[in-house]
Amino acid sequence: GNWVLKTAVKQCADWRKVLTDFHIGVNISYVQLCQDNITEMVLDTITEAGIPGDALTLEVTESMELQDYSYFNKIFYEWKRHGIHIAIDDFGTGYSSLGYLKSIDVDEIKIDRCFVSRIYCNNYNYRLMSNIIKLAHSSQIQVCCEGVETEEELTSLQQLIPDFLQGFLFAKPYTKEELEKLYMCKESLEYQERVERERKLYQISTIEEKNVTAENERDEIVNIVEGMDEVIYVSDIDTYE
């Protein structure tokens, strides 16, 4: 676990020489969090690599049971004080409950794919996802929906306005060499194909965002009218318009 963290942070530092705002997320396990020196080890790792804390997100494996909230919150507080972002991975599985949102001091929850899959034809999951996102946002917690694989899922999720979307629809896992071709070599065919694919996805997102805005405006007008005790209609006496 610690080797993975150090290797990932070192790689992040290398890529930031090309992409200056590159950000990396690394899983951190319950076993690691229970190490006596974990707080200092993480801070020493980013210092040695020469990257700022805000270039790193530590994704806590959500399926584990974090019973000692005060202990873990002290660790998270120290990391966050140095700019490190804390996320709960696979939210909604294992020991998860909405109680995490009031007990653990995190910046982000990553909602598991089981809630995302075919959300466009599952009203229960859609309502549940909507409520989770609203509750998280009310606590100033960002939301990432994991496992987005189809344009239909993207369209439905856009209506719920999460902060981030993640999944094979946008990108699959890449090797170091593949990622560099896709994001750092502008002359490569892979880079150009990625840009075109992302442009099309952006168009889908923009169209859906406009539709949601229009729906919200209509709903607002309906709510105003329904909230009135009396509605007076004024029309032209000749044309009735």
Which ranges hold each PLM region?
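Structural preference for long, well-ordered alpha-helical segments in enzyme cores
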Residues: 1-12, 41-42, 75, 132, ...
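EAL-family c-di-GMP phosphodiesterase catalytic domain
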Residues: 6, 29-36, 48, 55-69, ...
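PAS/LOV-family and closely related PAS-like sensory domains
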Residues: 10-17, 21, 237-241
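Short helix-capping segments at alpha-helix termini
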Residues: 15-20, 48-53, 79-82
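PAS-family sensory domains
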Residues: 45-48, 103, 238-241
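Sensory modules in modular signal-transduction proteins
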Residues: 212-238
